[in-house]
Amino acid sequence: MYAIIETGGKQYKVEEGAVLFIEKLADVEGEVVTFDKVLLVSKDGKVTAGAPTVAGATVTGKVEKHGKAKKIIVYKYKAKKNYRRKQGHRQPFTKVVIEKINA
């Protein structure tokens, strides 16, 4: 059984027990989070697609931890003009373990 959910402007294919690194959520570590935007559910070979979401379907997971991704460097310059800017960025994320798919 699997489902496709939408969170943080992205879509993820999830199964029970799967570990996801998603855009940061405001929930506290150890808290149970429910995803209501379920776009597709597959159960025993039967696929149910929503328009745009599957009615009554939810996915629950547990927030494991919050963190920041590896640093990326943003560097811009203009040739021959002595203009250089260097900036780093670390995107915050939330690690979620999927517990149950309710379809």
Swiss-Prot record:
Keywords: Ribonucleoprotein, Ribosomal protein, RNA-binding, rRNA-binding. One of its GO terms (biological process) is translation. GO terms for cellular component: cytoplasm; ribonucleoprotein complex; ribosome. The keyword Ribonucleoprotein applies. The keyword Ribosomal protein applies. GO terms for molecular function: rRNA binding; structural constituent of ribosome. It comes from the Bacteria. Transmembrane segments: none annotated. InterPro entries: bL21-like, bL21-like_sf, Ribosomal_bL21, Ribosomal_bL21_CS. NCBIfam families: L21. Part of the 50S ribosomal subunit. Contacts protein L20. This protein binds to 23S rRNA in the presence of protein L20. Belongs to the bacterial ribosomal protein bL21 family. This is Large ribosomal subunit protein bL21.
